[in-house]
Amino acid sequence: MVTGCVDLHQSFKSADSSSVPIPPPLPSKSDGLKKKLGHSSVSTATRDMWDRLFNDGYKADVVIYTDNGSIIYAHANILGTASTVIKGMLKQAKRHGKWHTISIRGVPHDAVRVFIRFLYSSCYEKEEMNEFIMHLLLLSHAYVVPQLKRVCEWHLEHGLLTTENVVDVFQLALLCDFPRLSLISHRMIMKHFNELSATEAWTAMKKSHPFLEKEVRDSVIIEANTRKERMRKRNDQRIYSQLYEAMEALVHICRDGCKTIGPHDKDFKPNHATCNYEACKGLESLIRHFAGCKLRVPGGCVHCKRMWQLLELHSRVCAGSDQCRVPLCRNLKEKMEKQSKKDESRWKLLVKNVLGSKKIGGSPFFLPVTNC
């Protein structure tokens, strides 16, 4: 049974001239070639006639020699019309009486039969396409049959491209100028590199095309490094954003107070409004520890060291130290002048990244990003 045929004509329905014609349907978003592969407007009888002409070889005038000494009979007019390359071969072929003789070797005999049949009727069996997809792809390129080329590409993109054949397809796609197919197969190789690099196909590619194998391997390394760098930047951005929120929460606690913690002159009410700063909870615990820790001198306690760092970061981003109610803000600003250039550069970079993490808007209590 024919499972794949490509349309050669557009079908249409006759309509009553007295009736208003039905408007055509909107274009489908699905792949147009997929629709063509599923049906044909050419009648079954017509397709059968072309297949029968090929199978019976009625008044054939071409002999095609394939591997293992096998022969396929065909018609010069049909082959020459379907492929300009074969047309040129027929012009140069030796003639024995009425017979033209050409050779198509290097692929299985059955693959050549499927190829020649497609030139007649644009049809193929699904099982044959599955079995000879690689050979048909090569033949479509070698003999310039764009229609078969598109069919082969479609089938590979929609199920026939697997980890078992992707290395071979990748090489063939580059050799035969299939840019889209080479991109798709390259992506699959990148995705399954560890599995594919241990296969016989990979070893064969390394032996026959060492530069290509090295290029693919290098691209895998570059992709892995790019992915790591992207992940690192994403993590850094999350940390900078958390630090920015911590700076906002610190100003909020020291200026307005939050629930049970805040300025000494603040009157806290039991029904204090819910805090909108997510960082307040963790920062509240850190401030309480800092206030009561006997080792809170710089470097004396891990938790206190973290608090000192937050206070220094605040002093560097604070826009108004004279009115600021965050402890030690002005003192730490004066301390900056005594720091080494190396430490100063490191802090400036941190400030720039923290302030830059707030892409939209910004706090009026912090310096603008451009001043960092």
UniProtKB/Swiss-Prot annotation:
Protein name: BTB/POZ and TAZ domain-containing protein 4
BTB domain mapped to chain residues: 60-128
Species annotation: Arabidopsis thaliana
Subunit record text: Interacts with GTE11/BET10 through the BTB domain.
Subcellular location: Cytoplasm
Cellular component terms (Gene Ontology): cytoplasm; plant-type vacuole
Region named Disordered: 14-37
InterPro entries per UniProt: BT1/2/3/4/5, BTB/POZ_dom, SKP1/BTB/POZ_sf, TAZ_dom_sf, Znf_TAZ
Predominant place of localization: cytoplasm
Span list, region CaM-binding: 341-364
Source taxon at top rank: Eukaryota
Pathway stated in the Swiss-Prot or TrEMBL entry: Protein modification; protein ubiquitination
Protein's job: May act as a substrate-specific adapter of an E3 ubiquitin-protein ligase complex (CUL3-RBX1-BTB) which mediates the ubiquitination and subsequent proteasomal degradation of target proteins.
Residues spanning the membrane: none
Inducing factors: Up-regulated by auxin (IAA), salicylic acid (SA), methyl jasmonate (MeJA), hydrogen peroxide, wounding and NaCl.
Zn finger intervals (TAZ-type): 238-330
SUPFAM superfamilies per UniProt: POZ domain, TAZ domain
